[in-house]
């Protein structure tokens, strides 16, 4: 139904967005360079947020209707499970559902902040990293609540790979490791502000090699 598919699409978009944020060199030629990778990262993040809102409405709407006696959502008792893995996942449904709403609200706030042009970059740099923590919470939410039958189809392994790679990317972000191997040392030798286009030009002299960069 809409609830499950919106959740899958949202997590898929967010996972790919985080994978792109890792700045994997081999992806740059395929995606047209780092600037286009980040543009895709941005729009996948926005897509993940929009579909997450749809997912949230799909979850809340039946309860809203039930509150006015328009419809009563069926809540059949879950059958007792003999599969040990499935039984464990069922015991985790409560915590997984409980973490969903706070993570969703945090996602909205952090993505909106990231899109505000007037929000200072020095704060954006710090708050944007919090999205990695939110993502990890949503991975737990998704792993536990995704339909067990999906794991037997191609969808399950695909989502597992995406979320595993996304989790690695989130952990690298939390540990401030993104782009570390590509950093170069240098000193600013001059700068010029262009008010017409609101661009600051900076001249820099490198004091170390810039991995992967070729002048010209």
Regions found by a protein language model. Name each.
Residues 1-216:
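FNR-like FAD-binding dehydrogenase module
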């Amino acid at each position: 139904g809409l609830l499950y598919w919106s959740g899958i699409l949202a997590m898929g978009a967010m996972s790919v967005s985080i994978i792109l944020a890792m700045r994997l060199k081999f992806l740059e030629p395929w995606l047209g360079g780092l600037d286009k990778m980040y543009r895709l990262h941005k729009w996948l993040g926005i897509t993940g947020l929009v579909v997450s809102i749809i997912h949230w409405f799909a979850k809340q709407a039946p309860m809203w209707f039930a509150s006015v006696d328009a419809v009563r959502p069926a809540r059949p008792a879950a059958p007792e499970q003999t599969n040990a893995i499935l039984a464990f996942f069922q015991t985790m449904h409560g915590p997984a559902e409980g973490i969903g709403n706070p993570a969703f609200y945090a996602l909205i706030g952090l993505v909106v902040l990231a899109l505000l042009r007037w929000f200072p970059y020095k704060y954006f740099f710090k708050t944007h990293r919090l999205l990695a923590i939110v993502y990890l919470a949503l991975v737990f939410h998704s792993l536990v609540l995704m339909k067990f039958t999906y794991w037997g189809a191609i969808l399950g392994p695909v989502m597992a790979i995406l979320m595993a790679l996304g989790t690695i990317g989130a952990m690298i972000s939390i540990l401030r490791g993104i782009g570390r191997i590509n950093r170069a040392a240098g000193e600013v030798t001059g700068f010029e502000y262009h008010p017409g286009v609101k661009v600051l030009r900076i001249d820099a002299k490198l004091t170390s090699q810039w991995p992967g960069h070729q002048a010209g």
